[in-house]
Swiss-Prot record:
Gene3D superfamilies: Uracil-DNA glycosylase-like domain. Excises uracil residues from the DNA which can arise as a result of misincorporation of dUMP residues by DNA polymerase or due to deamination of cytosine. NCBIfam families: PRK05254.1-1 (NF003588), PRK05254.1-2 (NF003589), PRK05254.1-4 (NF003591), PRK05254.1-5 (NF003592), ung (TIGR00628). This is Uracil-DNA glycosylase. It comes from Desulfitobacterium hafniense (strain Y51).
Length: 223
């Protein structure tokens, strides 16, 4: 069965045959059967489904999915419509307001970004309910490193937004032709130590315009 439905399939199909992925898959089947795991198994690869390889302009790298009920749906930092924005996302919206004057929306569903070429990728694609980082060591990093490496091989520059140490650890995979924006994580624990005031959204758009590309419309409308 073909797991990925767009141009990511050609780039990543060999990964699904690798021994590490077979082990990861077995582990996940058991986990989904016996525990509460987020996101829903049909949403695991949504970041890749919502934003095709060819369309990627910006990557926002997260850590692992939200681990509360009804939050995670496969896009980093995003929550399903109708679910209150978690604290990190509230801080992202505050910075977006101060950076570009965008109104803070009444929800945290970031599909509009994904549809414009913002790949919202977590480094681990699943998590146990209530246990942050619980799937960090089961093989996802190997898979998501391949995703980052595939983008890095593009001559066409991509903006990589790396918030926090986990995301910044991936910098070594990213080629020098790409534009990297770094700061501390938007979590309430660190946002005041350099996330607020870092202006990642205007920096990303300025770079895209300098490359002759359409900037991202970061404003999320109310629903």
């Amino acid at each position: 069965m073909q797991i990925l439905k767009n141009d990511w399939h050609e780039l990543l199909k060999d990964e699904f045959e690798q021994e590490y992925y077979q082990q990861l898959r077995k582990h996940l089947i058991q986990e989904y059967r016996t525990r509460t795991i987020y996101p829903d198994m049909y949403d695991i690869f949504n970041a890749l489904h919502f934003t095709s390889y060819q369309d990627v302009k910006v990557v926002i790298l997260g850590q692992d999915p939200y681990h509360g009920p009804n939050q995670a749906h496969g896009l980093s930092f995003s929550v399903k419509p109708g679910v209150p924005a978690p604290p990190s996302l509230q801080n992202i919206f505050k910075e977006l307001q101060s950076d570009l004057g965008c109104r803070i929306p009444n929800h945290g569903y970031l599909k509009k970004w994904a549809e414009q070429g913002v790949l919202l990728l977590n480094t681990s694609l699943t998590v146990r309910a209530g246990q942050a980082n619980s799937h960090a060591q089961i093989g996802w990093h190997q898979f998501t490193d391949k995703v980052i490496a595939a983008l890095s091989q593009r001559q066409d520059p991509v903006v990589f937004i790396l918030w926090g140490k986990n995301a910044q650890a991936k910098q070594s995979i990213i080629g020098s032709q790409h534009f990297i924006i770094k700061s501390v994580h938007p979590s309430p624990l660190s946002a005041h130590a350099g996330f607020f005031g870092s202006k990642p959204f205007s920096k990303a758009n300025n770079f895209l315009v300098s490359q002759g590309k359409e900037p991202i419309d970061w404003q999320i409308e109310d629903i």
